[in-house]
């Protein structure tokens, strides 16, 4: 079947819809905000290898006069990932008049753009919840296993990340002489579904983002902080399995610096593809069908399980 790409669309139309695609897709990239970003040059294959050198133990043995110490050896760990292509399309009937002002074409682009954002967000989320590091909440009072999330559970997760040498991701926000505000600690970032935001707010040390000393320090989707975690809430949170009482188990992600990476191919953004009415030739003899679609090359990879953890919880409030 003949495929009509953007090369067959007038330049002014291509420019408009490409911008629309990027503008609508990016705000939904919540989970990729703190990724290590890498690019594979075009025509250089489709696999990326992240490499990390192991640290050396402290050299506490004094050097003896005239004696060469045994020395040490370097150890490296490689993490590989492969670019894969993702995409989708919708069919448009002959009611569409192919102009840049056309409402159906515009709305099709809008819907596909939102799907692209959700797709990338979900791919990264699924990669995160695949980490081998997990902690079940146990200090809540809902009588389930795991329990709802509490301050003590969050402290347990923070302690585990600290013991794994995960670096904190934000600097402290110092207090200011403003009514009802409080300072914010240096923090890891946490991801949580909005379904259990009431449980988060019920934590003993929860500080709403509205009560940060400076609202300019608040990220989009940031709900507040507890202990050494600042929380971003999304309707695209993850749950898997059921608890002892049959409730969904929510996967609350807490991470430090350089815990995961994302890879793109060259300078390519999402490719926006329009097939005008009749582009199928004899397969569409009456010019009744066209389509709008996108495709995007992408890969994501966990880089250190000690620097990311899942805090498993159920819902109480």
Where on the chain are the PLM-derived regions?
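Surface-exposed ligand/attachment interfaces on beta-rich extracellular proteins
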Residues: 36, 142-147, 178-181
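Alpha-helical scaffold segments that mediate packing/assembly in large oligomeric complexes
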Residues: 99-174
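A generic local secondary-structure boundary/capping motif
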Residues: 38-39, 176-181, 219-221, 281
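Sequence/fold signature of self-assembling virion shell proteins
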Residues: 2-34, 144-171, 187-191, 195-317
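Short acidic, glycine/tyrosine-flanked loop/strand segments centered on an H-E-D-like triad
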Residues: 73-100, 266
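Beta-strand elements of well-folded, non-transmembrane domains
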Residues: 54, 94, 296-300
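N-terminal "assembly arms/tails" that initiate or stabilize quaternary assembly
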Residues: 1-82, 308
